[in-house]
Swiss-Prot record:
Xref: HAMAP family: Thymidylate_kinase
Keyword Disulfide bond: no
Lineage: Bacteria, Pseudomonadati, Pseudomonadota, Alphaproteobacteria, Rickettsiales
Record InterPro entries: P-loop_NTPase, Thymidylate_kin-like_dom, Thymidylate_kin_CS, Thymidylate_kinase
Protein name, entry field: Thymidylate kinase
Organism: Rickettsia bellii (strain OSU 85-389)
């Protein structure tokens, strides 16, 4: 029996260049083909206001706390206007990044920042966490090769190996901290179709 039920909130996490957005799209298209109500969204972004905040966040050098608060403000708008209404209507919601990305990208820049991110979410956001998170585990050296082949970039794309290793280690740590929620998909040696099949298998869709 499928693990999916109406109003399930699924997030995909990991560093840059790991094929995360591709997997979001593939799962979305598959669920649509099965006539399962589903929406696909992303963070930072997902609403008109949040997308404008995204442009500032990914293309502007901000102070670490300013960057964190920008991400949290965008999330509040996204949750209230899009994610929660979609879940209440019975949709599966697939989100490309959520709170774990904030912890790793913004939290790491602040003292006790990872704990701060989750505390802010608990205190300021509507009471919602993902039901399931897929961490797409791709080694940093492979991810950087993929990033370098891109035509477009933002400030996170152009940082060095040390940065990507820190992000990778952060996601690995979160997967151990939240094992009941985060499923690790080891994808360094797999093509997108193989990763997609593993995700479907975990969801009991095949």
């Amino acid at each position: 029996m499928s693990k999916l039920k109406q109003g399930t909130f699924i997030t995909f996490e990991g560093g840059e260049g790991i094929g995360k957005s591709t997997q979001c799209q593939m799962l979305y298209e598959y669920l649509k083909s099965q006539n399962i109500p589903v929406i696909l969204t992303r963070e930072v972004g997902g609403t008109n206001v949040a997308e404008k905040m995204r442009e500032i966040l990914v293309h502007t050098d901000l102070l670490p706390m300013s960057e964190l608060l920008q991400a949290m403000a965008a999330r509040y708008d996204h949750m209230v206007k899009k994610i929660i209404p979609a879940l209440q209507a019975g949709n599966i919601v697939i989100c490309d990044r959520f709170i774990d990305s904030t912890a790793c990208y913004q939290g790491l820049e602040l003292e006790n920042g990872i704990e701060l991110v989750y505390n802010l979410h608990k205190d300021l956001m509507p009471p919602l966490m993902p039901d399931l998170t897929f961490f797409i585990d791709v080694e940093s050296s492979i991810a950087i090769e993929r990033i370098n082949s891109r035509n477009m970039s933002n400030k996170f794309d152009v940082r060095g190996l040390d940065f990507y290793n820190k992000i990778y280690d952060c996601f690995k740590g979160l997967s151990k901290k939240f094992p009941e929620r985060i499923v690790t998909i080891k994808a360094s040696d797999l093509n997108p179709e193989q990763v997609h099949e593993l995700i479907k298998k975990h969801l009991n869709l095949i």
